[in-house]
């Protein structure tokens, strides 16, 4: 049954004239809403569409026509029979939005900048003044109009959203308006209002005059201004006062000009001139171009302008929503030079300014909502916009008025939820929305978005609550798929990496790369010196600091040039050092040549690595989950922290603090130079340096018998053969304390400067620059402090001549001639241990670097990485250089130093992590600098070793950030009420989390014990043991718990996915059957056959039917 609104006497509604009905009011309206079946429903398509239900609205009021809430052109169904209460988790608004938004692969819409201007009255003068703005969060002009508020989350009243919904239902909606100037837009809107009977023709000029008033924007001025700025402001003030004196005549001239233009024609061209004091131009003015706020607005953004105000000549609101075909520059309407695409106008009678302002804030907040902005761009009619508001209401959260002060501004969250999660409810295979009808009689059945509503049998949810909020599955990239072909994985890695090879070089030309190179370079040379010295001690200088420098430079640069993942940094590791020591001791005890024996072990290990590459053995890495990754990376981080502190404590042994110093016995502390017992009359060269106060004029050449030994310095005394005598001769200034200051100061300052990026001081670019170069600034500062004090702190010593550390060895190791023949095949067994160590170290580090949290867009290359590690192992074995493998901590530090974030972010929005600057330049430059460090020895000798130990400590601590294991360890020391809101704490019982963490701690302790003893030779085997332990955890923990605190293993992952697909298919088939079958009415539902109640306008009975767009209904 379709009702003609005009015949029924329906008038348009004033959305702001909402009044609470009093009990004593005569003839109250009765609104009865219930769903009516539409059997003309089309069958669900591939997207799972279900047609919306319909709602019939009654009003019984004698002598007074019905006020319509529905839009025009809406049909109703009057068929009787049983009502179809389909159990659905989606609201009709969500169904309609799915049809509006279409496919997800379409190009994204521009970001919207929304500005709200309110009409200000000053006597007879009026102007539009900017009162708030939005990009993501709301910023208000503070009281007094001198500054912007902090960005905050918009808090809207539910009533304002309902009023906005009614505004769009009753007002003028112009979609795809072909206009390019504000006067033309205003004329089109007014003409449409007059045609629809919403505005009297005699008010045309007055409304147009108000809407074309001058726009004054909020500008921010710095507190400290230069003299030039003060001079400009004074001259500007003089010109402003001159203009203000002639404001009255200008007003009349503008009004007269308006009458003349409108009397001639209503068709304006795009080059029409402004008719107001605003002098609206098509091009941005100087103030707009100089506005620094433009930096916060993303590129290619568009604007939506909201104009709200009250006037005394209107008796009902003037409401319009406009979308332009093409965005247009409206001159001074917008604060920044951004073209306008949307315009919302609300002018109403006087006395309701606060209500108008709240409606304006509501539409402005909706326009910056990710989902509603997409709806606004793609809406085809008024009903689509209403559906967008209804979807917003489906997800809205209401705060009780007695428990929350609306004046409190909510700080923007650190992480804003994506609109993709809300879009996912448009599919039948997804759980329901936040809000919806309960039971079976509403438009959307039970959709508990938090996991509760989707699981009930009566709610008709698709799946359980666990499925609704399960974390992302353990994703295995295509790089780890077993091909079954000889070198199949390696060939695919090469094909994947070749297209990216040119960009791997030009992507590295960025300022951020400089700080990354310096940071990693200092870490690498410190590592090379440390492990070089330890190798020299362990192998009797067959391998030392010089071999460590050259090997690091050669292996690292070749790997970064040709590997699959150039962000990985190669270095010597602790297990390799232990293996080298055991191998040297075994060779020495059995009379074998160490270098030749080592060469054959390296060759066999290289061949074994190539066999693993040829058979795609790297695919077993997919069984390495978070459990193994975190255990390995945490162990390496602890090793770095432990070694840094151990080195620092060692300084206290060489330069102890003088704890025996007693101030009372200061007179007994002395040290003097004593001549040798037998002093010959031997003369010495007079060119030898003496103390400044030594008298050398009496003896030339120098005669030791005539020398005053008590005046010589310590260095002179020892050089002339004298000896030091006294209780204070062994006193050393507090070098240990100074070393600790340098060590801890470097670490703490680096940590502070890294966090400075997120502080509130200085502009964003300055903070970013300081954070990127934090390591460099810290090293330079504390090197300067050390130089100022002039204490003999231990310095960095780099070899200055390129030659082997041991004089009796060369740069090439002969494979034959020094060991028995059986050594060559027998070396396969120790080579197998080395291969396991290399494979696990390399591939676990690669998994950590390539994890999805780093958002790497270029393909990984596990097989290609292992191939080059094997080749480099053979090359280093022939040249007698150390073996190299991926260094976990330094690689993580390399990733962190190259992270990219959004350059422009909305006020209040945290910079979004974009990914990592993937390139080969930084790695190659680091290792080239390491190689030429031999020639930089005169400069590097000024760097104190405690400063480099501080860099080591920072690397170890920084690599612990973001590790879930470390966060779970902290929970042992926190009461439950103070624990952070981690996602796994919401879904897994705390005792199960503690049990899982204890298992990891025990495994980590066992690995640490093995690493610290001679049993470290089996360390790589124990890393494989972590994978076995993880598989055994499936017997203790459920797959649900493991999905949150770890990852599901691949075969379990596949089973879970197949089970979910099967369950969703069954639910989808059941939903289709229920749509085709009529169901019985629940006992709580009253059925009213509409065909039996005819519309009778004479008796005041009006039946108005409209399409049901949501579970929300708002009646005035």
Curated annotation (Swiss-Prot):
Q: Which family does it belong to?
A: Belongs to the anion exchanger (TC 2.A.31) family.
Name this polypeptide is given:
Electrogenic sodium bicarbonate cotransporter 4
The answer to whether the entry has keyword Cell membrane is yes
**Compositionally biased intervals (Low complexity):** 233-247
The record's listing under PANTHER family reads: ANION EXCHANGE PROTEIN, ELECTROGENIC SODIUM BICARBONATE COTRANSPORTER 4
Keywords for this protein: Anion exchange, Cell membrane, Ion transport, Membrane, Sodium, Sodium transport, Transmembrane, Transmembrane helix, Transport
GO BP annotations listed: cerebrospinal fluid secretion; epithelial cell development; mitochondrion distribution; monoatomic ion transport; regulation of gene expression; regulation of systemic arterial blood pressure; renal system process; retina development in camera-type eye
- Which cysteines share a disulfide bond? none
NCBIfam families documented for this protein: ae
Which intervals lie on the Extracellular side per UniProt? 537-558, 622-631, 752-768, 841-865, 944-945
Q: Report biased composition (Basic and acidic residues) as residue ranges.
A: 1-14
Q: Which GO terms describe its cellular component?
A: apical plasma membrane; basolateral plasma membrane
In residue numbers, the region (Disordered) covers 1-92, 222-257, 431-467
């Amino acid at each position: 049954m379709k009702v003609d609104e005009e015949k029924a006497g329906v008038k348009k509604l004033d959305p702001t004239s909402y009044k609470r009905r009093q009990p004593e009011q005569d003839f109250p309206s009765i609104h009865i809403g219930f769903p009516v079946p539409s059997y003309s429903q089309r069958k669900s398509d591939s997207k799972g569409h279900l047609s919306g239900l319909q709602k019939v609205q009654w009003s019984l009021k004698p002598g007074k026509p019905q006020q319509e809430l529905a839009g025009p052109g809406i049909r109703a169904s009057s068929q009787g029979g049983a009502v179809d209460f389909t159990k659905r988790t989606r609201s009709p608004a969500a169904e309609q939005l799915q049809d509006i938004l279409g496919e997800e692969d379409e190009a994204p819409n521009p970001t919207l900048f929304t500005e709200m201007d309110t009409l200000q009255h000053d006597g007879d003068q009026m102007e539009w003044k900017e009162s708030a703005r939005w990009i993501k969060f709301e910023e208000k002009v503070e009281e007094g109009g001198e500054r912007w508020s902090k960005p905050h989350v918009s808090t809207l009243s539910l009533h304002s959203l309902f009023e906005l919904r009614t505004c769009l239902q009753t007002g003028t909606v112009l979609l795809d308006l072909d206009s390019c100037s504000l006067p033309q837009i205003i004329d089109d809107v007014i003409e449409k209002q007059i045609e629809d009977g919403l505005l009297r023709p005699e008010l045309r000029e007055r409304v147009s005059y108000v809407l074309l008033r001058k726009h004054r924007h909020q500008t921010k001025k710095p507190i400290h201004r230069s003299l030039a700025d003060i001079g400009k402001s004074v001259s500007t003030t003089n010109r402003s006062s001159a203009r203000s004196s002639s404001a009255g005549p200008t007003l009349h001239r503008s009004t007269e000009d308006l009458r003349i233009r409108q009397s001639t024609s209503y068709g304006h061209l795009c080059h029409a001139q402004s008719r107001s004091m605003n002098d609206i131009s098509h091009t941005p003015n100087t103030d707009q171009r100089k506005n620094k706020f433009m930096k916060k607005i993303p590129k290619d953004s568009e604007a939506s302008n909201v104009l709200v105000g009250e006037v005394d000549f209107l008796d009902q609101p003037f409401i319009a929503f406009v979308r332009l075909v093409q965005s247009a520059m409206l001159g001074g309407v917008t604060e920044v030079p951004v073209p306008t695409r949307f315009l919302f106008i609300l002018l109403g009678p006087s006395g309701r300014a606060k209500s108008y302002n709240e409606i304006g804030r509501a539409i402005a907040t909706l326009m910056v909502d990710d989902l509603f902005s997409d709806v606004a761009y793609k809406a085809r009619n008024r009903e689509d916009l209403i559906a967008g508001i209804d979807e917003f209401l489906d997800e809205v959260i209401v705060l009780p008025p007695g428990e929350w002060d609306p004046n409190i501004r909510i700080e923007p969250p650190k992480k804003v939820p994506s609109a993709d999660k809300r879009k996912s409810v448009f599919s039948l295979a997804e759980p329901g929305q936040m809000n919806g009808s309960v039971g079976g009689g509403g438009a959307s059945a039970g959709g508990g978005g938090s996991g509760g509503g989707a699981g009930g049998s009566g709610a008709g949810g698709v799946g359980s609550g666990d499925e609704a909020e399960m974390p992302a599955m353990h994703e295995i990239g295509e790089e780890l798929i077993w091909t079954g072909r000889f070198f199949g994985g390696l060939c695919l890695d090469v094909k994947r990496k070749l297209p990216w090879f040119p960009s791997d070089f030009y992507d590295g030309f960025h300022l951020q790369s400089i700080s990354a190179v310096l940071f990693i370079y200092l870490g690498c040379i410190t590592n090379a010196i440390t492990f070089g010295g330890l190798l020299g001690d362990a192998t009797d200088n067959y391998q030392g600091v010089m071999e460590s420098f050259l090997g690091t430079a050669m292996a690292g640069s070749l790997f970064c040039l040709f590997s699959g993942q150039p962000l990985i940094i190669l270095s010597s590791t602790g297990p390799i050092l232990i293996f080298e020591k055991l191998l040297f001791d075994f060779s020495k005890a059995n009379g074998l040549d160490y270098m030749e024996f080592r060469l054959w072990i390296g060759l066999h290990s290289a061949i074994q690595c190539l066999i693993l590459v040829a058979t795609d053995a790297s695919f077993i890495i997919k069984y390495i989950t978070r459990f193994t990754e975190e255990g390995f990376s945490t162990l390496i981080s602890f090793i770095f922290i432990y070694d840094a502190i151990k080195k620092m404590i060692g300084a206290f042994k060489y330069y102890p603090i003088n704890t025996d110093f007693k101030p009372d016995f200061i007179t007994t502390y002395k040290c003097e130079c004593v001549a040798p017992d037998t002093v010959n009359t031997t003369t010495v060269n007079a060119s030898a340096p003496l103390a400044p106060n030594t008298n050398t004029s009496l003896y030339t050449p120098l005669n030791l018998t005539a020398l005053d030994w008590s005046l010589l310095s310590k260095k002179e005394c020892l050089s002339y053969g004298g000896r030091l005598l006294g209780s204070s001769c062994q006193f050393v200034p507090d070098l240990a304390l100074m070393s600790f200051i340098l060590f801890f100061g470097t670490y703490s300052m680096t940590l502070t400067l890294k966090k400075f990026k997120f502080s509130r001081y200085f502009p964003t670019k300055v903070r970013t620059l300081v954070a990127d170069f934090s390591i460099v600034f810290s090293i330079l500062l504390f090197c300067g402090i050390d130089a100022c004090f002039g204490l003999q702190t231990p310095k960095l010593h780099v070899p200055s001549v390129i030659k082997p550390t041991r004089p009796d060895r060369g740069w090439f190791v002969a494979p034959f001639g020094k060991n028995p023949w059986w050594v060559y095949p027998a070396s396969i067994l120790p080579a197998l241990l080395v291969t396991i160590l290399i494979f696990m170290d390399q591939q676990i580090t690669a998994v950590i670097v390539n994890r999805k949290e780093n958002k790497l867009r270029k393909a990984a290359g596990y097989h290609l990485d292992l191939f080059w590690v094997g080749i480099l192992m053979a090359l280093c074995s022939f040249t007698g250089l150390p073996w190299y493998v991926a260094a976990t901590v330094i690689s993580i530090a390399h990733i962190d130093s190259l992270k990219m974030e959004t350059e422009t972010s909305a006020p209040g929005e945290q910079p979004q992590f974009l990914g990592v600057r993937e390139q080969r330049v930084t790695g190659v430059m680091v290792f080239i600098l390491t190689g030429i460090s031999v020639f930089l020895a005169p400069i590097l000798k000024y760097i104190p070793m405690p400063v480099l130990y501080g860099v080591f400590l920072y690397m170890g601590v920084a690599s612990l950030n973001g590790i879930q294991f470390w966060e779970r360890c902290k929970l042992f020391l926190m009461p439950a009420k103070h624990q952070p809101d981690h996602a796994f704490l919401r879904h897994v019982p705390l005792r199960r989390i503690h049990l899982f963490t204890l298992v990891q701690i025990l495994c980590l302790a066992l690995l640490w014990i093995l690493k610290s003893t001679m049993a470290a030779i089996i360390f790589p085997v124990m890393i494989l043991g972590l994978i076995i332990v993880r598989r055994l955890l499936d017997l203790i923990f459920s797959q649900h718990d493991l999905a949150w605190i770890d990852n599901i293993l691949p075969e379990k992952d596949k089973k879970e996915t197949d089970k979910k697909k099967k369950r969703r298919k069954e639910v989808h088939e059941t939903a289709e059957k229920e749509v085709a079958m009529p169901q019985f009415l629940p006992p709580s539902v009253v059925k009213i056959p509409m065909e039996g109640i005819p519309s009778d306008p004479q008796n005041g009975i009006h039946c108005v039917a409209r399409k049901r767009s949501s579970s929300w209904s708002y009646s005035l």
